[in-house]
């Protein structure tokens, strides 16, 4: 009997290859398997599973697989008559730097929360287009200015996610056991090194840009992201519902929209004018982000309650918070329809009214199929909201 080992983020421990014993059953929750062949050890990975294995038949695990599951070299799997799981290595198995690098990159992709990083990239790219008035504005100076904004804000965004994970390791053992610092893919030392590198890079790039709006934006973003997570009597804003909502609004709305807009105006030598479109974007994304922050905490009630984090969901209940956020988002879309309808341009009026009506309808339909008490359902709804954000970054160009 033999099976292929697969990676799982939910288990830990060591298994040993003992070829002198027979195969009967497998019951293990271990993660890092080590096989012995002579005096050498062969690191491998094994999925966490409670299954009986028939030694005469093949089986396939029905255990949950990580979305970032790695493709690794095949091993054979079985168990001894004592219930001890064992592994037989393939002769050609060996650890390579490519495998290690791939594993670390996969861990970093989870560590950086790609959906948030993508939102930052799309948002900055979109807002940077608002000051442009003609094709001639697509100059080398514009693209340099865009990169000057993208790199430090992206580093600051990943820093915010990383510092939160460094501080919340114990809570994440309950709420998010797949995160690299919890699963062991990253050590605490590696996490701190990444945070330090991101901090240096974001400020170095902001300073070298010689752009006051950009530096102020990056500094405020960094300070809010730090205050949101770090332990301090006056900080740790994520445990204070009102400050947590302000933090999300500040990060995604009040900071990026105006500072990137003014930065590009400065790069292009245009007068500092706060346009109708950037004013709408700042207000809309601030409201949307505050609701995102509250919805983000809905699946984490168990861990937050155990560690005394009095989020809105812990205080008022998941269903009430979900319903309130949904109504606020619908109000924001309704306001967007009104603002769009007041445009003097027929094209802008038509696109903004129809576009926001469609997005609001999609929001309602998705909300009806979401169960606030089901963490997976709520997390899926949370990710859906980011798709609505991506669409909004297109519509803001018609709010003129």
From Swiss-Prot:
A GO CC term attached to the entry: chloroplast
Transit pept. (range): 1-48
Keyword Transferase tagged: yes
Domain of life: Eukaryota
Stored CDD domains: PT_UbiA_HPT1
Residue intervals passing through the bilayer: 116-136, 143-163, 204-224, 242-262, 278-298, 321-341, 345-365, 379-399
Activity regulation information from UniProt: Inhibited by psoralen, a major downstream product.
Tissue expr: Expressed in roots, leaves and stems.
Record's subcellular location: Plastid, Chloroplast membrane
BP term (GO), one: cellular response to UV-B
Enzyme class: transferase
Catalytic activity: umbelliferone + dimethylallyl diphosphate = demethylsuberosin + diphosphate
Functional description taken from the UniProt entry: Prenylates umbelliferone in the presence of dimethylallyl diphosphate (DMAPP) at the 6 position to yield demethylsuberosin (DMS) as the main product, together with a minor amount of osthenol corresponding to 8-prenylated umbelliferone. No activity with other coumarin derivatives such as psoralen, bergapten and xanthotoxin, or with geranyl diphosphate or farnesyl diphosphate as prenyl donors.
Protein name, entry field: Umbelliferone 6-dimethylallyltransferase, chloroplastic
Gene source species: Petroselinum crispum (Parsley)
């Amino acid at each position: 009997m033999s099976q292929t080992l697969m990676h799982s983020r939910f288990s830990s421990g060591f298994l040993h290859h003992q070829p002198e014993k027979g195969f009967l059953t497998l019951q293990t929750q271990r993660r890092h398997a080590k096989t012995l062949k002579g005096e050498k050890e062969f690191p491998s990975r094994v999925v966490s599973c409670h299954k009986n294995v028939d030694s005469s038949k093949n089986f396939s695990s029905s255990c949950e697989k990580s979305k970032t599951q790695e493709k690794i070299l095949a091993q054979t799997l079985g168990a001894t008559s004592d219930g001890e799981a064992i592994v037989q290595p393939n002769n050609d198995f060996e650890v390579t730097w490519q495998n290690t690098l791939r594993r670390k990159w996969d861990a970093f992709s989870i560590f950086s929360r790609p959906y948030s990083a993508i939102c930052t990239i799309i948002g900055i790219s979109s807002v940077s287009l608002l000051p442009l008035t003609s094709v001639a504005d697509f100059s080398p100076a514009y693209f340099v200015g865009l990169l000057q904004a993208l790199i430090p804000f992206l580093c600051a965004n990943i820093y915010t996610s990383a510092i939160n994970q460094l501080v919340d390791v114990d809570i994440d053992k309950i709420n998010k056991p797949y995160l690299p610092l919890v699963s062991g893919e990253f050590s605490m030392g590696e996490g701190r090194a990444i945070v330090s590198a991101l901090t240096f890079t974001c400020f170095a790039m902001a300073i070298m840009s010689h752009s006051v709006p950009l530096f102020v934006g990056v500094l405020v973003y960094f300070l809010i992201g730090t205050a949101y997570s770090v332990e301090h009597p006056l900080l740790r804003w994520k445990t204070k519902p009102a400050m947590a909502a302000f933090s999300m609004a500040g990060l995604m709305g009040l900071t990026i929209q105006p500072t990137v807009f003014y930065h590009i105006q400065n790069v292009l030598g245009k007068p500092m004018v706060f346009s109708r479109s950037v004013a709408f974007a700042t207000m809309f994304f601030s409201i949307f982000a505050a609701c995102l922050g509250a919805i983000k905490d809905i699946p984490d009630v168990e861990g937050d309650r155990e560690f005394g984090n009095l989020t809105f969901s812990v205080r008022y209940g998941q269903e009430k918070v979900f319903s309130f956020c949904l109504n606020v988002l619908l109000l924001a879309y309704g306001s967007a329809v009104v603002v769009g309808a007041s445009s003097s341009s027929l094209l802008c009026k038509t696109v903004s009214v129809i576009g926001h009506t469609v997005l609001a309808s999609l929001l309602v339909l998705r909300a009806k199929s979401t169960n606030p008490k089901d963490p997976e359902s709520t997390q899926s709804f949370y990710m859906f909201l980011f798709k609505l954000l991506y669409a909004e970054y297109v519509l803001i160009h018609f709010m003129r």
